[in-house]
């Protein structure tokens, strides 16, 4: 009898683990990844991820953070009402000359796994950036 009760308890706990709500069930982000393209060193690019509450209840963003200190997401301080879209500002420092890929995490109240989005690009030294821009032509604008 103890084995049956133990098995039933384990089974119910397993079902509960699979029934966890996911971030994708309550929010929709306009894009999973934003590519800044080429950016000028020490000119921090900014992107605004759009987060929409697709549930029927307010969504609380407990925290936002990035995979390193060179990337700064703003905090979302107010609950997101059902059907409402808010913007999450993400800024990259652009201090180091190199390609970059950085993850940004969005932790929602009541959901264990945070939602992740990503920014990518390549930082060029100022002279190299200006040369690249001239080669692209005056008609084209950088992405950032």
Residue ranges and their predicted role:
Residues 34, 84-90:
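Short strand-edge motifs at loop-to-beta-strand transitions and within beta-strands
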Residues 56-84:
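Surface-exposed binding patches on compact interaction domains or structured appendages
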Residues 20-43, 50, 111-144:
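Long, low-complexity ectodomains and other extracytoplasmic segments of secretory-pathway proteins
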Residues 42-48, 95-103:
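Short, solvent-exposed loop/turn segments enriched in Ser/Thr/Gly
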Residues 51-55:
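Asparagine-centered strand-capping/turn motif at beta-strand->loop junctions
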Residues 93, 107-111:
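Beta-strand-rich extracellular modules
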Residues 1-24:
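Bacterial Sec-dependent N-terminal signal peptides
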């Amino acid at each position: 009898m103890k084995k049956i009760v133990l098995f039933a308890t384990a089974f119910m706990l397993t079902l509960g683990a699979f029934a966890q709500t996911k971030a994708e069930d309550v929010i929709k982000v306009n894009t999973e990844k934003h590519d800044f393209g080429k950016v000028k060193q020490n000119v921090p690019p900014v992107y605004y991820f759009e987060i929409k509450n697709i549930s029927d209840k307010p969504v609380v963003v407990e925290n936002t953070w990035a995979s390193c200190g060179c990337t700064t997401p703003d905090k979302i301080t107010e609950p997101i009402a059902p059907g409402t879209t808010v913007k999450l500002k993400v800024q990259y420092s652009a201090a180091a000359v190199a390609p970059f890929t950085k993850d940004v995490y969005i932790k929602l109240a009541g959901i264990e796994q945070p939602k992740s989005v990503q920014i990518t690009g390549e930082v060029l030294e100022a002279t190299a950036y200006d040369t690249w821009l001239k080669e692209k032509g005056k008609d084209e604008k950088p992405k950032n």
